[in-house]
């Protein structure tokens, strides 16, 4: 079995001949995604988002366009402008998502999955945050290690781009990648990446089972629920229901659940221990005549 066959056996691409959109930045991960998708026999269309955040960003787009031309792959360039300032990574990610099709495939690997788990742990995430990308059809390379993908790309005739910002330690993900994970591996005396990825998979199965147990709760709207009934629920069930009902948009970067502190304050409102509470996303949860109201 050659390298491409081995990586494809661990990937989760759709059936050959399927039309797919790929996010191709030109880096080794996305270039590996492109080459493997073609090896799989998919009908590929490549998308590249130019944020114009670096002086050379247009050169990157030109480089990807040349590669796509050589591979006879349709290339679509998206020009977006992201204003400098705080939370730039999140806003740039939101701009990418808005520019490309929702079903676009990305080159996230197992290493990206584990980095996301650790970042979410530091935010105090629950089940959802600790099981990212698992069974996500837009992340077909989530079971492939980054180094293996890069080795595959290095054997191709194409030169990948390297974003120098991936080495800058002022970005939290880079510190997790370059500092935290190596320390964890050293302390554990083993490679923790596949260990944490497996843990995420197991937790995902348990989360899916919990979803089945609470399926009837999904049909209960926030403002139609009777607080007297909700107050009798086990706390874990009530928290789970509130997390879904109180999720909010975060600067256009997808839907995010409320923090643990927000959920606890909402529980107090449900149980009549508080009249109202302020929540994220500029919302306020209040209780009147045994009914909840989100404004």
Descriptions of predicted regions:
Residues 109-261:
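Flexible helical/loop "lid" subdomain adjacent to adenine-nucleotide binding pockets
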Residues 1-179:
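Core alpha/beta nucleotide-donor-binding catalytic domains of modification enzymes
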